[in-house]
Amino acid sequence: MSLDMKEHPDAEVQKNRVLTLEDWKDKWVTRHISFHQEQGHQLLKKHLDTFLKGQSGLRVFFPLCGKAVEMKWFADRGHTVVGVEISEIGIREFFAEQNLSYTEEPLAEIAGAKVFKSSSGSISLYCCSIFDLPRANIGKFDRIWDRGALVAINPGDHDRYADIILSLLRKEFQYLMAVLSYDPTKHAGPPFYVPSAELKRLFGTKCSMQCLEEVDALEERHKAWGLDYLFEKLYLLTEK
């Protein structure tokens, strides 16, 4: 069944659902991190050349990065990676699992926040809320890889999120995003259901949107949530 047939009219059902930053920190403490992909994201791997366009020395942003292994992929290719993640556990595990030495220091601009930097200087991970991140003046980016980010943001915060993302984009950017489609009356989220109409509303004025691929992503754990279908859709957003 195609995704378009499954554009659910009940997207509103999730609009008041809220997870706090503490809720997300607790997921790392209690190891409820089934969202982490140890082998990396296969659609990103498949479309990596399209995303990078053969360019070198790019700045790549990972919103809500967790311990995504893809950050190492980009750094190994000579790019500079910046991520933001609320869980210090996730950040420390990234460096440990990738065998990278790092430094950490408090961020003067944001109370309680820290920045963790690989000794090579190619990876900087900010431990704070993405909504506080603009105060750190992290600059602009050539590429953004958004997997498990927009779909993890409380639906009521979509506009704030989109404003921050758009503010981080350089000229001639490529913004690659993976979103999920399922019946939101059967699962409260996260990950949240983000219909294409919502993407257009959030990003359509500034970005051209192209769907690169749609795959059936239903796993046993999703069936346990009560879902009978789940599609993942990969979008490439570029400058209008």
Swiss-Prot record:
GO biological process terms held by the UniProt record: methylation
KW Cell wall biogenesis/degradation (keyword) present: no
Record: residues binding S-adenosyl-L-methionine: 24-35, 64, 85, 129-130, 147
Cellular compartments annotated: Cytoplasm
Gene expressing this chain: Tpmt
Species the sequence originates in: Mus spretus
Gene Ontology MF: a single term: thiopurine S-methyltransferase activity
A Pfam cross-reference name: TPMT
This protein's name: Thiopurine S-methyltransferase
